[in-house]
Amino acid sequence: KGYLYWGDSPWCAKVESEDAAKCTLFPASRLVTDSKRELLESLTAAEKAMVRSVFLTQPLPENAAGATLLLPRSFVEDGLMTQAEQNAMFKAVAAKYTAGPLFIKTHPRDTTDYHALFPDAVILERTMPSEVLNFCLPFKFARAVTVQSFVLRAFTAADEKILLSLEEAQALLN
């Protein structure tokens, strides 16, 4: 019969959703609420440390008070600018919005050398899902900043979330 995606297979008895009441793709009788958020929030400190150890290749700084998280994406890979233009733009974004220690969570497709661009920043592994930041770090960021990305929509690990358009970020270069 060909490829049947998601819960469309006749052999699929139920479809799990974070919140079945908000899902409109399937009838309510086929849906089950299974909140991963609640599961992750219920982890003990030791369990969270174990999850961190999977993704972190270096220890976290002792003091992360007032930390800013920059979540860049690759505009170079998307053909929207050169590497030099992207580097300059993210340096300008970081200069304007960083307060306290700077953490950078790179996008999996982004091959930029953020260690070279921001030698004092804590660079989180590109293989770490950004969702892990919501529950596994022992602190909350004061601010999270991204450019033309939806990554902050479900992000809960920052007191302030700043979503810049590409035009707003590029304007910081002037």
What kind of region is each of these model predictions?
Residues 98-126:
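Catalytic donor nucleotide-activated moiety binding site of glycosyltransferases and closely related
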Residues 78-79, 110-116, 169-173:
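Short, charged/polar "capping" segments at the starts of alpha-helices
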Residues 82-96:
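Well-ordered, non-membrane alpha-helical segments in soluble/globular domains
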Residues 65-77, 106-109, 149, 166-167:
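Short loop/turn segments at strand-loop or loop-helix junctions that form parts
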Residues 1-67:
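A nucleotide-sugar donor-handling region in carbohydrate enzymes
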Residues 131-173:
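A donor-sugar binding/catalytic signature common to diverse glycosyltransferases
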Residues 3, 14, 21-31, 116-129, ...:
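Active-site regions of enzymes building and remodeling cell-envelope glycoconjugates
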Residues 39, 43, 72-84:
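Surface-exposed cleft-lining segments at the edges of enzyme active sites
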